[in-house]
Every structure is written in C-alpha cells, then in structure tokens.
C-alpha cells in the first residue's frame, strides 16, 4: 500500500518568533599535579518554540497492489482513494520543543616542567539531543551519543616534533526509507481549475516508448524521521615537523597524513530507484588517506 498527501490551503501567517534556548552548565576542575589537569562538565539545554512545518487538515491518498497485477502498470494498482488525515504544509510555525543533555570529561597534560617533552589531552563526551513533535521523540540531526578525542605532541629533539590526533564519534541519525511507492497526482479532469482527481502517475517506458509505466518515489514513511544511525566515525591523523633557520629566516617543514589507516567514514547515503524497482543506496564517504608535504616561513 502507499499514501500520498494533499496539502490544504495555507491560512496561517508566515510570521514566526525566534527559537529559544536556556542552557544550564556545571563544571569542576582540578589540577592533579603541576602538569595534569582534570576537568568535567555537565549540561542541560532546554529548547522552546522550535520551528516546524505546520500541520493542517488535509487528505492522504491511498492505493494498494492488485494481486497478480503488474506493478509497472497502472492496472497493477487500485484506484487511489482519499483517506482523511493531517498534512504537513510548508508554513513554518513555532510548535515544537526539545532538549539536549550530557557530560564531558577532559584530562590534559601540560608541558610546563623542564625536561618534559610530551603534551596532549584526552576527552570523552556522552550526549543526548531530542525534539518532541506530534507526540513523537525525534533526535536532532547533530545527536551523537559518544565522542572521543586523543591528541598528543612529542618533542623528538633537534627541533623535530611529532603530533597525532585520533577522533571517534558514534553514528549520527539519518532517515532510512521503508521502500518505494507509486507517485499519485491530482488532475483537473472537469476543467474547473481545481486539481481534485487522484491518479497514479506514469511516464513513457524506457523499454517500450509506446507504452507508459508507473513512476515510483522513495517512501520515507509518514512518521519515520531519523530512524537509523550511520556507522561510527573514526580516523587517525599524524604530523611531523622540523624547524630550522635558513637565510636568517625561521622555516618549518612538515608532513601531514590525514586518515592514516584509510578508514572509510560515511557522510551520508543517496537513495534511488533501481531499474528492477528495488531501492538502491549509494554511500557518500569522506576523503581516504591524504598525505601532504609543505613548509612555512616567518619573515
């Protein structure tokens, strides 16, 4: 079965107020030694008057497969019928609220004592970020449960330095489609200027231009937003630098290697309709291993 929405005429004003947020933060900090610092922080953010699409009384159109029918043909689907329900409009209104809360820990090593060659820090954060809309709990796009950062810098002597950074983040939410559905259009069949007759949309067949086939759209579901998570993100970057003086100027030569173990980190997914009417998915990833050589000069 599939549904299509008919939008009711917009009656509301396009004016809306500003979104509001109140932040509550508490933190503790303690020097364990002259070089080691421990810091922890907890927070809560209360979001109000978040802007969402206005819901108005409209109509959903519903069609089902005909048993044994050809799904590429209009005859393979029942005639679309109206199912009274709510519809999302493009009118923005302040009609949602949300919250974000979490805790962060930081252990930092300062390079403050004579003979100390290493500095860096380790951090960990645990967080939740949700909005509440239409009795649904929906994560924000930036909702990330766990993040870890490990950063270090070591002096090798003779103006050589080695630095590294490892990052980890659990997956961000995204909306996974639930399948495909025929596209339903409203046509003006009585020439009164009002499209009101629902039909299953078709186009010329690629295989046979003399016949038409049903147009399919990706079905994300009516209340299915951010129902899945991307894979975790992590990578290791290193940097080697050498400082020297040439021609009475300060020179720094460096080698950067980003994503040294060539991790495939997913940015997102692109969904499309395959020729065999299955749901296709293409992974969009960040850059692979990327070495860079360069220098800088201070005049």
Predicted regions and their residues:
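Residue-level detector of the transmembrane beta-barrel scaffold of outer-membrane proteins
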Residues: 1, 37-39, 117-121, 151, ...
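Gram-negative outer-membrane beta-barrel transporters
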Residues: 44-46, 58, 62-173
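C-terminal beta-signal and adjacent terminal beta-strands/loops
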Residues: 46-49, 159, 167-217, 229-235, ...
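Outer-membrane beta-barrel signature, preferentially recognizing the C-terminal barrel domain
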Residues: 1-39, 43-47, 69-73, 82-102, ...
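Extracytoplasmic loops and strand-loop junctions of Gram-negative outer membrane beta-barrel proteins
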Residues: 5-12, 73-76, 84-92, 132-135, ...
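Residues on the lipid-exposed face of transmembrane beta-strands in outer-membrane beta-barrel proteins
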Residues: 16, 26-30, 103-109, 122, ...
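Outer-membrane beta-barrel translocator domains and adjoining extracellular loop/strand segments
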Residues: 1-4, 42, 51-57, 64, ...
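Outer-membrane beta-barrel proteins
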Residues: 12-16, 28, 91-95, 110, ...
């Amino acid at each position: 079965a599939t549904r299509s929405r008919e939008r009711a005429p917009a009656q509301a004003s396009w004016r809306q107020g500003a979104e509001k947020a109140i932040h509550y933060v508490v933190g503790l900090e303690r020097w364990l030694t002259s070089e080691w610092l421990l810091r922890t922080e907890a927070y809560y953010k209360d979001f109000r008057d978040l802007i969402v699409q206005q819901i108005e009384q409209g109509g959903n159109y519903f069609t089902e497969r005909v048993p044994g029918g050809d799904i590429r043909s209009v005859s393979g689907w029942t005639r679309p019928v109206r199912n009274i329900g709510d519809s999302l409009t493009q009118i923005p209104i302040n009609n949602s609220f949300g919250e974000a809360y979490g805790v962060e820990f930081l252990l930092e090593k300062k390079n403050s004592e004579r003979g100390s060659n290493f500095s860096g820090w380790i951090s960990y954060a645990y967080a939740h970020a949700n909005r509440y809309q239409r009795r649904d709990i929906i994560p924000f796009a930036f909702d990330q449960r766990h993040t870890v950062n490990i950063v270090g810098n070591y002096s090798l002597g003779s103006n050589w330095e080695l630095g590294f950074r490892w990052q980890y983040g659990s997956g961000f939410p995204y909306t996974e489609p639930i399948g495909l559905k025929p596209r339903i259009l409203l046509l003006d069949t009585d020439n009164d200027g009002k499209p009101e007759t629902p039909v299953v949309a078709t186009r010329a067949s690629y295989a046979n231009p003399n016949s038409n086939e049903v147009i399919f759209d990706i079905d994300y579901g009516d209340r299915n937003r951010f129902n899945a998570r991307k894979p975790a993100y992590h990578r290791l970057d290193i940097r080697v630098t050498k400082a020297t003086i040439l021609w009475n100027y300060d020179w720094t030569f460096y080698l950067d290697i980003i994503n040294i173990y060539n991790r495939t980190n997913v940015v997102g997914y692109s969904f499309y309709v395959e020729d065999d009417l299955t749901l296709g998915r293409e992974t969009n990833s960040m850059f692979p291993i990327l070495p860079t050589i360069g220098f800088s000069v201070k005049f």
